[in-house]
């Protein structure tokens, strides 16, 4: 799935509303919280985000074609930011380390240890500061980036998928 920080409302709504056992009130609360967290992207400062998407998320019709066009457009907008590095892990990549779900590792300036934010549909999204877990996620991210398409190739693929979703 597209990481929660990058999801448009229709995409997030489709994912959350279809989770078994979730009431409509729970879905609305989770949706509001997810969209509220996206304000982090608007904060001033030098934060940098490195994002790797599995190619499958570009093909899977979450919310339908209109939502997918909007989602592709959002990914392209974010990728144009000097603070975002966006890559796609292609189907042909050998490794499966990136198929375990989305996560964000935040490294703070100064002495503070890094923390991880882990997206989950089956449980509440969570933040971890457990050293072993964060180190494992940092290592996993390095492996995923090495197997991913270049930034230019990734943007080209997202543009192509946006064209496909519009036809």
Which sequence ranges carry the predicted segments?
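Hydrophobic protein-protein interaction segments
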Residues: 1-167
